[in-house]
Design a protein with these regions (language model features):
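Kelch-like beta-propeller repeat domains
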Residues: 1-329
């Protein structure tokens, strides 16, 4: 059987972009990619500007925003529901973990502080966030007292937090995990829990149950701080850290450049090799900003910046299209 393939395209960039950074976040709304947060120097937030990239003109600009503008932060996440972006948590310049939830209305360019009290997730950074058409999901991360393994949902219609059942002991608290919504279920993939992890867990909101799933095939090696998105019945992952630095977050660990796909129905992993027309592979990196997106009618993974094996922050922009026809997508 021929190997599965994927196509990398390096996107042209014009205008006033975010520059080199890691531990930041992006989200796609319509034909614009929004970027927020991150660091150029380890643990030092760059700024709190909201950068927007028009995919039709390949041009960056700084959004002219109003409202409750979030302070600078690293280890932040964001996800979009409709035309609204939600930003949660992170770590500020004083290395304080944060727990505010902000929304940004892309139709009015207005920030709103949605939640900052005790009714939502505890303060954290380097957690993971994803969304469906009604909820923003927050999982794990680095909390004040250690790594976390809780799953929260923010209902954007009811405007309230929902704390989901706590998973079993097998799902250890972790930072930098993959998180994806696939066919109504929430999947937690890998992450760092003192060591790099290689386990996969699934939460069914309808039954409020957690299951650790056993996968097979070309299983990726244990990793964290990788890029992960859900497309159809698949979870696509790219890159990440496979061996942490002795300097912790101040240094660069060993990164990988591999891409894999997990079929959530068969629970089989397959590696995605570079296909014809794939150019400018991003190479090994982690701590990137990423989002699922659709460009030129193709579903795939948007990837901006990140940290390199030399501990240099990156400022390039890629789109990865997995060629999933061979497995029924």
């Amino acid at each position: 059987m021929s190997p599965l393939r994927g196509k990398w395209v390096k996107l042209d960039q014009k205008g006033n972009g975010p520059g080199a950074r890691s531990s930041h976040a992006i989200a796609l709304v319509g034909h614009k990619v929004y970027a927020f947060g991150g660091e150029f120097t380890p643990r030092e937030p760059v700024d709190n500007k909201l950068h927007e990239f028009d995919v039709e003109t390949s041009t960056w600009s700084v959004a002219d925003v109003t409202g409750d503008i979030p302070p600078p932060r690293v280890g932040v996440t964001m996800a979009a529901v409709g035309h609204t972006i939600y930003v949660f948590g992170g770590r500020d310049a004083a290395h304080k973990e944060l727990n505010e939830l902000y929304s940004f209305d892309t139709s009015t360019n207005k920030w709103t502080l949605v939640s900052s009290g005790d009714d939502g997730p505890a303060s954290r950074s380097y957690h993971s966030t994803t969304s469906d058409d009604r909820h923003v999901y927050i999982f794990g991360g680095c909390g004040i007292a250690g790594r976390l393994n809780d799953l929260w949902a923010y209902d954007v219609v009811e405007q309230k937090w929902i704390k989901n059942p706590t998973p079993g002991y097998s799902l250890k608290g972790r930072g930098g995990p993959g998180l994806a919504v696939v066919q109504g279920k929430i999947w937690v993939v890998y992450g760092f829990s003192g060591v790099e992890m290689d386990d996969v867990h699934c939460f069914n909101p309808a039954e409020e149950t957690w299951v650790q799933v056993e996968t097979s095939g070309e299983n990726p090696t244990a990793r964290s701080v990788f890029s992960a998105v859900g497309i159809g019945k698949y979870i696509i992952i790219y890159g990440g850290e496979v061996d942490p630095s002795d300097l912790g977050h101040l240094g660069a660990g060993k990164f990988t450049s591999e891409a894999y796909v997990l079929d959530t129905e068969t629970l089989i992993w397959k590696r995605l090799d570079d296909g014809p027309g794939s150019d400018n592979h991003p190479g090994p990196r982690g701590w990137c900003a990423f989002a699922a997106g659709c460009l030129n009618g193709k579903q795939g993974l948007l990837l901006y910046g990140g940290n390199s094996p030399t501990n240099d922050r990156l400022d390039d922009f890629f789109f990865f299209t997995p060629c999933l026809d061979a497995v029924g997508y």
